[in-house]
Amino acid sequence: TASINNSSQSRDVTFIADVRTAQIAVLEVTQDNAVADGAMANTLRARVTDAFGNTLAGQTVSVMAGNGATVAPTVITGQDGTVEISVTSQTAGTSAVTASINSSTASRNVTFIADVRTAQIADLVVIKDDSVADGAMANMLRARVTDAFGNALAGQTVSVMAGNGATTAPTVTTQPDGTVEISVTSQTAGISAVTVSINNSTLSQNVTFIADVRTAQIADLVVIKDGSEADGLTANTLRARVTDAFGN
């Protein structure tokens, strides 16, 4: 507005934000803890301004994501200077998302979690075998539970069965690394098939129990031929059977 005496006139002038000083003013996580299924996304919002805090529309922001996560390499700010960034992953854990423009950079961490809906027995390994069939000494197995993309799943309940009269806990729970050890005892010598399952996923491994020589005993002694001639040649015969304390 210009004025003199009682005379004045006004005109509008426009100042525009300075794209030369474009910077990442804010980078915030707006959704976190998405499932690591390659489809569900964590989201962030970036805001671009000039050096004096004026919002900048139509600016190209470069984006990178760590730990195997997927993100569009560039995004463009809207009229308010903000832009939403969507990040997906098939790898559970933390992903560092970095947004940059000119020489201005900001980073935030987002977290992807394993998908319990696709829990499966990834492997079942015998870690101790050939235990004595005394009902106390145990064969051991280790099961590992993951989601469909191989991410470890903690706190999952695994069902367990053992054949040939062996004894095991009916359920076990996985540790933070997705594994759990399974103890199996038996009083019956021989092979026991141990089966673990979760959802529709099942694996089996055989373990072997051996008779306990420490408790060897004569279980029975039977005459199988008697009344032979006393000629020093013809023999009477008997059959002895030796077992451990549990009849193995």
Question: Over which residues does each language-model region extend?
Answer:
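The feature marks long extracellular or luminal low-complexity segments
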Residues: 1-248
